[in-house]
Curated annotation (Swiss-Prot):
UniProt name for this protein: UPF0284 protein PMM0439
Organism, as annotated: Prochlorococcus marinus subsp. pastoris (strain CCMP1986 / NIES-2087 / MED4)
UniProt cross-references to CDD domains, sorted A to Z: DMB-PRT_CobT
Superkingdom classification of source: Bacteria
Family: Belongs to the UPF0284 family.
InterPro entries membership: Nict_dMeBzImd_PRibTrfase, Nict_dMeBzImd_PRibTrfase_arc, Nict_dMeBzImd_PRibTrfase_sf
Gene Ontology MF: a single term: nicotinate-nucleotide-dimethylbenzimidazole phosphoribosyltransferase activity
HAMAP family documented for this protein: UPF0284 (MF_01086)
Length: 385
């Protein structure tokens, strides 16, 4: 029987009822203490036609992460600078995260990396914005090793200095493709296990792109996680790897809110740390995502592949949030497989449920804010934004 608490469900075969309730209880106790990071990052991999639904076209995808961050910080308001990109179906998951953020009284720290534009809003600078996005992974040289190491060290420093549990979310167009590339670089066959923001994941296209990148990367024996990120990864992975490891060195809990992109960071960390410390490292790490993503693909199987490879006990938590009652097509589209996750929607909604808010309250607030977004013209009505 699938374990659940307040509708929150467990995924991953190594989970058991005792561990599940221990994890949920630990999260519930920490809700008011988290430091929330939204890492927005750029990779030219997102410019491949058909690779991502995070924007209707390649031009839109260049600003998707900035628009997501702006909305998460401020919600719907008339003085917005970035229009949320037009989507054929659904709406940005930043809407869910914003609503839940307000409900649980959280505040986010935005970390822009490789965005090519300095945000006007408050943010944490970890490198010069002129560094630009990572190259397309088909080059086999996404970023130079020095940049990867620098981002890793910045994350590590911030993580080690933290005195509170941390929550990591992301907005990285093209990020599920770089996540898959990282996993395949370490020998995992995951092509049929990786989801997508698209209703039908472009598996054949991703396979072609990743094969080309790994062939050109020509990773030699004894390569490490930083080599893999340098070859086929993205800036989010480099920084978040350091942030995760640093926070665990500081004995803090870490919530990784997302799907395959967060599991890629877990894999990178397990490949990087000392083999004798892996279970202790993973004990206070949480993978939190939406129920839509778990339903859409074999995320539990993907998690199991990683835990079996490294002989650790890691479980995932899936949010019970649903839009079955919504009168808005943009929201009900989630129920048929569009968008699914992003910007920490799964983890943020789990925290809202744990704080006592109901599905109806979250849905109602999402609908109110969606109407405001439309009234204020915050969603582009054009296919070219």
């Amino acid at each position: 029987m699938q374990k659940s608490y307040l509708g929150i469900k467990l995924f991953g075969s190594k989970g058991n009822q005792k561990l599940f309730f221990e994890k949920v209880d630990a999260l519930q106790k920490e809700i008011n203490n988290f430091i929330f990071y939204l890492v927005i990052a750029g990779t030219e991999t997102s410019q491949i036609q058909g690779i991502s639904a995070a924007g209707i076209d390649s031009k839109a995808r260049r600003r998707t992460a900035l628009a997501d961050a702006e909305f998460l910080l401020f919600g719907a308001y008339k003085d917005h600078k970035y229009k949320l990109p037009f989507l054929n179906s659904g709406v940005t998951p930043a809407l869910i995260s914003y609503v839940c953020k307000k409900l649980i009284c959280a505040s986010q720290i935005v970390v822009p990396i490789g965005i090519k534009e300095k945000p006007y809003f408050s943010h944490l600078t970890v490198e010069n914005y002129l560094a630009g996005p990572a190259k397309c992974l088909t080059t086999g040289k996404s970023m130079n090793k020095e940049r990867v190491l620098s981002l890793y060290k910045k994350g590590l420093e911030i993580g080690k200095s933290t005195k509170q549990p941390i929550f990591i979310s992301e907005s990285v167009p093209g990020g599920t493709t770089t996540a898959q590339a990282v996993m395949e670089a370490f020998g995992l066959n995951v092509n049929n296990l990786i989801g997508s923001s698209l209703i039908n994941a472009p598996r054949a296209l991703k396979t072609k792109v990743i094969k080309a990148g790994l062939l050109k990367a020509n990773l030699k024996n004894n390569f490490d996680s930083l080599d893999v990120i340098s070859s086929v990864g993205d800036p989010f992975q480099a920084f978040s790897l350091g942030l995760l490891i640093g926070a665990r060195l500081a004995k803090q809990s870490v919530v990784l809110s997302g799907g395959s992109q967060m599991l890629a960071v877990i894999l990178l960390a397990l490949e990087f740390i000392d083999s004798t410390e892996k279970q202790e490292f993973i004990d206070l790490v949480f993978i939190a995502t939406t129920g839509w993503l778990v339903k859409d693909n074999s995320l539990g199987d993907l998690l199991d592949l990683i835990t079996e490879k490294h002989n650790v006990n890691l479980l995932g938590l899936a949010s019970p949030l649903n839009f079955k009652s919504s009168k808005f097509k943009e929201l009900s589209d989630y129920e048929i497989g569009y968008v699914k996750e992003g910007v920490g929607a799964g983890g943020m909604s789990i925290l809202a449920f744990l704080k006592g808010f109901s599905n109806e309250e979250i849905v109602s607030s999402c609908q109110v804010n969606l109407e405001r977004m439309k009234d204020l013209g915050q969603i582009s009505i054009n296919k070219d934004c």
